[in-house]
């Protein structure tokens, strides 16, 4: 019997060749938002390795929305041609090309991780950061400028325009980044948002910005193309977002035309203990799928083919996203297929190795 991990997944008009996706992972190798040869090598290698979906790293909808000065961007029409080259490469190798649209909010303007990852002051090439309030992410981080009504409207418009550019570049899958303490999660979590206007307060108020962004993106994105949202399903503290909150948010997003929830967690504040272990976020994907009646992706320390196959077979998630495991092994899907007794053809140039 064919392993469940290697069955196709169809959402709208898009069919993935299997249930394995590459999670968006920043490479900190862009120049002025433009991809470089590193991105072509990095993304092309994983497409050749057999994944069904590749989601480009957090791609900023505005210059100030970048995590670092070295992040991909989609804030200018000038970015379209370079991104289109990546799309064509990925799709020529049998994978579907997706993109994660993002705004880093108060966690923006930091250096590369391997260079310390510290905040960069505007005088040194950084930029002012924004958030729901003036509360910085952590000691030593800059004080955000609280977004007013005009600032919020700009963010929503930036996501909408970025969506148009993503379509022009040929992407067939969009993911809105609303996790890991970045702008949309910062608004969504009670740990990051104590506003007393219509964008704060209870969950309905805190979800408003994400809802407005989702509506703007869905309006510009063809109805037959998949739209996903990455959520931090838990802040891992009772004072923060809970899985019950996330189920409610997922129901709202489903009503807005979102097709899939990418179930991650954490990132809203430092110093919170996360019980990391194999598949530690899979229960979130299972609960959201079951209680919100929406497709989900499982992500986080999924490394064994048998485990990944069981996630799909058991109905815990519709899609398995791999991150660091694909950094370690670009050909993980080919190896997983062999381990599960499935014949997944490598590129013909590599046949002699398989």
Swiss-Prot record:
One of its GO terms (molecular function) is NADP binding. The active site is at residue 182. It is an enzyme of class 1 (oxidoreductase). It catalyses: A + NADPH + H(+) = AH2 + NADP(+). Optimum pH is 6.0-9.0. It comes from the Bacteria. Its EC number is 1.6.99.1. Keywords: Flavoprotein, FMN, NADP, Oxidoreductase. Highly thermoresistant. Its cofactor is FMN. FMN binds at residues 23-24, 26, 58, 100, 230, 301, 323-324. InterPro entries: Aldolase_TIM, OxRdtase_FMN_N, YqjM-like. Homodimer. Behaves as an active monomer in solution while in the crystal packing assembles following the classical dimeric architecture of other thermophilic-like ene-reductases. Ene-reductase that catalyzes the stereoselective reduction of activated C-C double bonds. Shows very good activity with 4-ketoisophorone, 2-cyclohexen-1-one and 1-octen-3-one, and low activity with maleimide, 2-methyl-pentenal, 2-methyl-cyclohexen-1-one, 2-cyclopenten-1-one and trans-2-hexen-1-al. Shows the highest catalytic efficiency with ketoisophorone. Exhibits a restricted substrate spectrum with generally lower activities compared to other ene-reductases. Belongs to the NADH:flavin oxidoreductase/NADH oxidase family. NamA subfamily. Is a robust biocatalyst showing high thermostability, good solvent tolerance and a wide range of pH optimum. This is NADPH dehydrogenase. It comes from Chloroflexus aggregans (strain MD-66 / DSM 9485).
């Amino acid at each position: 019997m064919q392993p469940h991990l290697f069955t196709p997944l169809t959402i709208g008009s898009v069919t993935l060749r299997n249930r394995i996706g590459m999670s968006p992972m920043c490479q900190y190798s862009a120049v002025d938002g433009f991809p470089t040869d590193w991105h072509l090598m990095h993304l092309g290698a994983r497409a050749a390795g057999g994944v069904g979906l590749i989601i480009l790293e957090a791609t900023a909808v505005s210059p100030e929305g970048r995590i670092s000065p070295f992040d991909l961007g989609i804030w200018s029409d000038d970015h379209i041609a370079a991104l289109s080259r990546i799309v064509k490469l990925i799709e020529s190798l049998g994978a579907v090309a997706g993109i994660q649209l993002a705004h880093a909010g108060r966690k923006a303007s930091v250096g590369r991780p391997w260079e310390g990852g510290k905040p960069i002051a505007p005088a040194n090439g950084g930029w002012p950061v924004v958030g729901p309030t003036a509360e910085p992410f952590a000691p030593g981080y800059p004080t955000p400028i609280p977004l007013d009504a005009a600032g919020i409207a700009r963010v929503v418009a930036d996501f909408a325009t970025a969506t148009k550019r993503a379509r022009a570049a040929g992407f067939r899958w969009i993911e809105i980044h609303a996790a890991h303490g970045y702008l949309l999660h910062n608004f969504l979590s009670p740990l990051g948002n104590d506003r007393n206007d219509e964008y704060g307060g209870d969950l309905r108020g805190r979800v408003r910005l994400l809802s407005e962004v989702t509506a703007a993106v869905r309006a510009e994105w063809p109805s037959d193309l998949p739209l996903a949202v990455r959520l931090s399903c838990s802040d891992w503290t009772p004072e923060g977002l809970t899985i019950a909150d996330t189920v409610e948010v997922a129901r709202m997003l489903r009503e807005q035309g979102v097709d899939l929830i990418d179930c991650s967690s954490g990132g809203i504040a430092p110093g919170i203990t996360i019980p990391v272990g194999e598949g530690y976020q899979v229960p979130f994907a299972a609960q959201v799928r079951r209680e919100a009646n929406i497709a989900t992706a499982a992500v986080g320390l999924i490394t064994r083919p048998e485990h990944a196959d069981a996630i799909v077979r058991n109905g815990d998630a519709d899609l398995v996203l791999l991150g660091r495991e694909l950094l370690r092994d670009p050909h993980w899907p080919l190896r997983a297929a062999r381990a599960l007794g499935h014949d997944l053809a490598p590129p013909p140039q590599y046949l002699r190795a398989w």
